[in-house]
């Protein structure tokens, strides 16, 4: 796995999932999101426990395909796994990894906002909604809800902010300390923060829950949290 050094040099553009990021993404995400491996294992297990033969599962912003590959390996059923991403560089790595593991996954280059979804049992979105502009975020969640079958599940992870400014700063400081322990320098941390400005737009935990409820989900609950990183499960059922 190539080590992430993307922000070791002065940035010249806003953050994007280009070839440079894709080449180090697996290392970047593992060192940038606390308990990422454990969190993805939790998401995988939620999915595996809620699918049956031929169920359709979408991963929105699938990046290099690691989660869908893990689901394919762990599920006792043959599933229709569809990974969508806007980055060709990410998808090339996803195709290569899936082939190496001998699993069948339909990776597609797509705009998840305009994509025509088929009925599905599961939707996954790991740290993807936060990159969708706020005006388009709720309409996307509505599309997800509409495409889910009854009792279908939307599992999504998001970086969140606190409504309390003091706590929010403290959580950010704790997070930056975490990144330093992962080997990132103060310069790299500052560079990435600047590159993500107005690209990653987080909501509070409450705003995320209110959004999915407004779209029709009868149940939503956080199932994992570390400081300002949260994973939610929302279920399509009558309130």
UniProtKB/Swiss-Prot annotation:
<feature type="binding site">
    <location>
        <position position="126"/>
    </location>
    <ligand>
        <name>S-adenosyl-L-methionine</name>
    </ligand>
</feature>
<comment type="function">
    <text>Catalyzes the conversion of S-adenosyl-L-methionine (SAM) to carboxy-S-adenosyl-L-methionine (Cx-SAM).</text>
</comment>
<dbReference type="GO" id="GO:0002098">
    <property type="term" value="P:tRNA wobble uridine modification"/>
</dbReference>
<keyword id="KW-0949">S-adenosyl-L-methionine</keyword>
<comment type="similarity">
    <text>Belongs to the class I-like SAM-binding methyltransferase superfamily. Cx-SAM synthase family.</text>
</comment>
<dbReference type="GO" id="GO:0016743">
    <property type="term" value="F:carboxyl- or carbamoyltransferase activity"/>
</dbReference>
<protein>
    <recommendedName>
        <fullName>Carboxy-S-adenosyl-L-methionine synthase</fullName>
        <ecNumber>2.1.3.-</ecNumber>
    </recommendedName>
</protein>
<keyword id="KW-0808">Transferase</keyword>
<dbReference type="InterPro" id="IPR041698">
    <property type="entry name" value="Methyltransf_25"/>
</dbReference>
<dbReference type="GO" id="GO:1904047">
    <property type="term" value="F:S-adenosyl-L-methionine binding"/>
</dbReference>
<feature type="binding site">
    <location>
        <position position="193"/>
    </location>
    <ligand>
        <name>S-adenosyl-L-methionine</name>
    </ligand>
</feature>
<dbReference type="InterPro" id="IPR029063">
    <property type="entry name" value="SAM-dependent_MTases_sf"/>
</dbReference>
<feature type="binding site">
    <location>
        <begin position="111"/>
        <end position="112"/>
    </location>
    <ligand>
        <name>S-adenosyl-L-methionine</name>
    </ligand>
</feature>
<feature type="binding site">
    <location>
        <begin position="61"/>
        <end position="63"/>
    </location>
    <ligand>
        <name>S-adenosyl-L-methionine</name>
    </ligand>
</feature>
<feature type="binding site">
    <location>
        <position position="36"/>
    </location>
    <ligand>
        <name>S-adenosyl-L-methionine</name>
    </ligand>
</feature>
<dbReference type="InterPro" id="IPR005271">
    <property type="entry name" value="CmoA"/>
</dbReference>
<dbReference type="Pfam" id="PF13649">
    <property type="entry name" value="Methyltransf_25"/>
</dbReference>
<comment type="subunit">
    <text>Homodimer.</text>
</comment>
């Amino acid at each position: 796995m190539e080590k992430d050094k993307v922000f070791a040099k002065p940035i010249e553009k806003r953050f994007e999932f280009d070839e440079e990021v894709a080449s180090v993404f697996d290392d970047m995400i593992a060192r940038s999101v606390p308990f990422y491996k454990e969190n993805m294992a939790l998401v995988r297990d939620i999915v595996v426990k809620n699918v049956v033969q031929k169920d359709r599962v979408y991963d929105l912003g699938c990046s290099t395909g690691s989660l869908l590959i893990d689901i394919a390996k762990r599920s006792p059923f043959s599933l229709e796994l569809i990974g969508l991403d806007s980055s060709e560089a990410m998808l090339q790595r996803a195709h290569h990894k899936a082939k190496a593991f001998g699993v069948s996954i339909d990776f597609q280059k797509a705009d998840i906002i305009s994509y025509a979804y088929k009925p599905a049992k599961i939707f996954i979105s790991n740290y993807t909604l936060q990159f969708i502009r706020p005006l388009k975020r709720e309409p996307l969640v509505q599309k997800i809800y509409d495409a889910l079958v009854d009792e279908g599940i939307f599992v999504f992870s998001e970086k969140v902010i606190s409504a309390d400014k003091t706590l929010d700063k403290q959580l950010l400081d704790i997070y930056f300390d975490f990144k330093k322990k992962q080997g990132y320098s103060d310069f790299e941390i500052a560079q990435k923060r600047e590159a993500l400005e107005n690209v990653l737009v987080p909501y509070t935990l409450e705003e995320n829950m209110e959004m999915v409820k407004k779209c029709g989900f009868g149940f939503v609950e956080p199932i994992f949290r570390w400081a300002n990183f949260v994973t939610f499960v929302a279920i399509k059922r009558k309130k």
